Amino acid sequence: YCDDCFNAFANINDSSVDLIITSPPYNLGNNHHTGNKKHQAYNDNLPEKEYQETQIKLLNECFRVLKEDGSMIYNHKNRIKKGVQISPYEWLFKSKFVIKQELVWINRSQNFDKIRFYPWTERIYWLTKNPKTKLINTINKHDVFDWNEWKPVGTRGLHTRAFPEKFVA
């Protein structure tokens, strides 16, 4: 689908999807373009309450379409708003999902901040409907992985934080 996610969800049956992988906009306070002229810009500067409510709505729609034994991989990061850190846990706990595991992705940002330690990590959450859902770890990885191990491919400079394809393959 290439559509607003809430429009697309209307066309997906309940409990019909095995795996969902997403990395939503982080609400960092900018207007972004995809780098592709046929895609429109999106506003990444919602009031925090509205952003979190939208994330909960998104997560609950994913929950609806996910099969009982399915999994969701949700990539997000801790953010700083008005000088205070905001964790994705603030809205993940308000969704219907079970948080099976939190993975730490070291992506080594080259940015720096003169007033705090600059984050080099993002989080990847493994979410399920059922706490008994299991993972078969065929890639023999741990819960912390380094950006340098899995470089994203095929981005051609259009997306600086592309998700490593090897992780989901």
Where on the chain are the PLM-derived regions?
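Core catalytic lobe of class I
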Residues: 1-169
